[in-house]
Swiss-Prot record:
The keyword DNA-binding applies. Transmembrane segments: none annotated. Residues 98-125 are annotated as: Disordered. One of its GO terms (molecular function) is DNA binding. Residues 100-125 have a biased composition (Basic residues). Pfam families: Hc1. The gene is hctA. Belongs to the histone H1/H5 family. HCT subfamily. Might have a role analogous to that of eukaryotic histone proteins. This is Histone H1-like protein Hc1. Keywords: DNA-binding, Repeat. Coiled coil: none annotated.
Length: 125
C-alpha cells in the first residue's frame, strides 16, 4: 500500500469509529461491537502507516513544501528588542533631570581564567 492509501483508510476508519461511538453512547450494542472491531483494525493500519512513513522519510518523499518551510523560518527568527527608555520624575530639590535614560542591558558574566599548577623541580640526584 502507498502512504496516501494508508492515510485514507485511517481517516475512513476514524470517521466510522466516531459515528459508531455516538450510537454506542445511546445504548446501541451492535455499534459498540463495531467500535471494538474497528479500533483493532485501526491499530493494524496505524502500524503499517508508521513503517511506510519511516520509509518515505528515508527516501526523501516527505519533504516540506516551500511555503511551509518559509513559515517555519519566519517563526524561528526572534524579533529584535529595542532599548527601553525610562523617564525620571521631576523633583523639587536642587537639580533634577527630566531626560530619558536608556536602561543598560545585562552583560554576560566575565570569563574566568583557569589557573594551572606550577611544576616543581625535584632536588634529588
Amino acid at each position: 500500500m502507498a502512504l496516501k492509501d494508508t492515510a485514507k483508510k485511517m481517516t475512513d476508519l476514524l470517521e466510522s469509529i466516531q459515528q459508531n461511538l455516538l450510537k454506542a453512547e445511546k445504548g446501541n450494542k451492535a455499534a459498540a461491537q463495531r467500535v471494538r472491531t474497528e479500533s483493532i483494525k485501526l491499530e493494524k493500519i496505524a502500524k503499517v502507516y508508521r513503517k511506510e512513513s519511516i520509509k518515505a522519510e528515508k527516501m526523501g518523499l516527505m519533504k516540506k513544501s516551500k511555503a511551509a518551510a518559509k513559515k517555519a523560518k519566519a517563526a524561528a527568527k526572534k524579533p529584535v528588542r529595542a532599548a527601553k527608555t525610562v523617564a525620571k520624575k521631576a523633583c523639587t530639590k536642587r537639580t533634577c533631570a527630566t531626560k530619558a535614560k536608556v536602561k543598560p542591558t545585562k552583560k554576560a558574566a566575565p570569563k574566568t581564567k583557569v589557573k594551572t599548577a606550577k611544576k616543581t623541580r625535584s632536588t634529588k640526584k
